[in-house]
Amino acid sequence: MNNSEGKNFLVDVLKILPDDLDCLIQAPSLENSTIQAMMLDSEFDYFKSIYLDKERKMDFINEDVDHSIGNYIQHIQIRKGVELLFEGFNGVEHGTLSKLVNIPAWFKEKYIPDTCRRSSEW
């Protein structure tokens, strides 16, 4: 995978997901003040919580485009309500999308199956 593909993977995932998302993020070395201001404590050790409405989702995307914040994320879970929609690991270089997510053809061509897979369970 080239660097631009890895950098854009998280951005592209967020673009195909709906707004109003709950994210659990494990990123102990992330020092980006914009993202840190969005983070709240979560009920899970080592994870912070971020709620992404439409505006905050765009802010998050812009921070990743400008500062590659995805590189600092060890583990991310993105949910809509109780449904897990995406789980990513290791700088969000790869991940798994829910079978409930409508995946556009351009995303499939760019990322599936090498960078992203589709869960058959959730």
Where are the regions a protein language model picked out?
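Structured alpha/beta or helical-core interaction and ligand-binding surfaces enriched in interleaved
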Residues: M1-W122
